[in-house]
Structure formats: C-alpha cells, structure tokens
Amino acid sequence: GGRFCDAMAASGKMKVLAVDYRLAPEHPFPKGLDDCVDAIEYAVRNSNRLNIDPAHISVGGDSSGGNLAIASALSDRCVGMIESLVLFYPVTKAFADNSLSWKKYGEGYGLDAEIMDVFNRAYAGDVDPYDERISVGMCDSKMLERIPRTLLVAAGRDILCDQGKEFAAKVGSRIMRIEFPDAVHLFITVPGQDKAFGESVSLATDFILNR
C-alpha cells in the first residue's frame, strides 16, 4: 500500500521502491510476478545509482502483494538476493481453504470469500490455482528453505488468518508472526485502523534494520 510505503520512507532509515506491477484480470499470472522479480533484479543491478546496499534488500507486501513477495523469494532468479520479507496478511492459497477463519470471517470483514474467489480466478487465469508459484503455501519444506528471515503480521479477524498461520508453521523459525487480534484485512492500506497501522510501521522498521 502506498500509505505504508510513505510511512516507511518517512522514517528516513531506508530507501523504499514501490513496484507498479501489472494487475489481473488484464494481466494474469505470471505477469505481476515477473514485474516484481524484474524490480528486485533492477535494484540489485543498479544499487550504486540508487545508493542502496545490495546485501540488504527487503521485499514486502500486503494481501496479494504479500503473495508476490513470497513468490519472488521462491523464484530461481531471486535466490540469494533477498535478505528479508515483510508480509501483511498474505495470500498463500489462491483457492477457498475452508479453514475456520475462512468460514468465520468470509463476509463483512474487509475481504469476502466471494470476492476472494473472483480475485484468485482472475490472477491464476489459465494456470492451476494450486500451482506452487501461485499458492505458495502449497510448497514443500525443501522449496520453503529459500524463504529468508520473515516478519508476518496478521489480522485476527481476517479470512486469510489461518492460511497465514499455517504458512508460518511450515516455514518455521525463520518467521516471526505477530497478530493483531482485533484487526481486519487491509489495515495497512485502508485508513481507520490507526493502532495496527502505526505499530506495523514500527515493527517492520525494526525488523528490517535489526538484521
């Protein structure tokens, strides 16, 4: 979210590059992922011009952007390039997971199950939504070894809460998972959940800098 990127940049402690990746349904998988991987490679390749340290690249995103951040870290082209991930309520399964949170918060909590289904089908396009490059939570433990140290911030009242929790458990000790129990989906993007937003800025900043 642009407002979160602005807040991170305003800290004065890091450079922030916001990727304007192509969106579904006009540009289904893998177009958006390709754009993200291209951007990471660009940042590393042009680190001198951007005045950044290529050894300290963090990649982050919320919801579908969190999915793209994870998929970028898993891609062959980005192996070894990303020092850390910062994820907010990421999509890790691009299909109805029928978990408790999916059923309990599937309507009226910022992201409805019906809308999520439309988004998932639009992004997957002609590709199987269970494909590990789309549903990153389906990756096996060997593939997940590519995941760097990660901060995963969850919304407790969110349709995606349980799939994020399951993903964190699969990755293991490299993930720090923090949950705001009363928050709903999109709390870093849509104004109105100021406490969760403010604490997330601090959490993300500290996590990125305290390597």
Name each region found by the language model.
Residues 1-211:
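Alpha/beta-hydrolase superfamily serine-hydrolase fold, recognizing
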